[in-house]
Amino acid sequence: DIYFGTAHRGRLTLLSTVLGMPYRGILSKFQGNSNDPNEVLGSGDVKYHLGVSSDREFDGKKIHLSLTPNPSHLEAVDPVVAGKVRAKQTILNDKTTDKVFGILIHGDAAMAGQGIVAETFAMSQLRGFRTGGTIHFVINNQIGFTTTPHYGRSAPYCTEIAKMVQAPIFHVNGDDPEAVVHVCRLAAEYRNLFKEDVVVDMFCYRRSGHNEADEPMFTQPLMYKKIKQHPTTLNLYKDQLVKEEVLSEEEAKTKISDFKKFLDNELILRKKNK
């Protein structure tokens, strides 16, 4: 079993690509539809708080995945995930901690700014709370809403707090997908071997605003001028694959076009997913 805890950024992608939630199901939620209309007396919660569990198969092996629901209070989900992992390990009598573990996905500003992160690390090695290590993944977009790093923390890196338990910290470039995958595999192997926390700090950027209403050119004009001129990770990786002759330019364009058509079709089918 793997238990996930994350905030808003990247949550919908996690739901679809990792937990296998159909895109039409996610889009249906944006239409205000509910699995059970009688379950709430109101309009419900934002979609970025949605929790889902699923059973998936990877490399011929079945695994249970669970994304814990969370409130808008960043990082509040951290000890909840750790507690769920510990509880499931107890139920399964998983003394080796090989069967169940947790993955926490943080934002850079919240990682450094929210005290609950430090509290979760502080409890991670205690006999009554340890889980055999949590994998921490930081989506480091180098901004917290409108706060830049040098106004948000005193340390050079947002991950400094992890040093309190001597957790190894891997800094990786988000524009290099293969490097990110390599480091994540390394982090997973470290956790499984040494049964301790490990951190992956992925340096990237936030291409749009903090939310649907935020226009970052008002508060960070210089930063966002550079971001607008910077090619997307998709295009950078596509160009790399074409250069390495893994696929042709035409094949790449076809794959991108086919996926957009797939999403358009899911948007149509969402109406049936009420």
Tell what function each PLM region has:
Residues 1-116, 121-135, 140-150, 154, ...:
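Conserved internal helical-beta-strand scaffold that buttresses enzyme catalytic cores
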Residues 157-161, 229-230:
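A glycine-rich, aromatic-flanked flexible loop/lid motif
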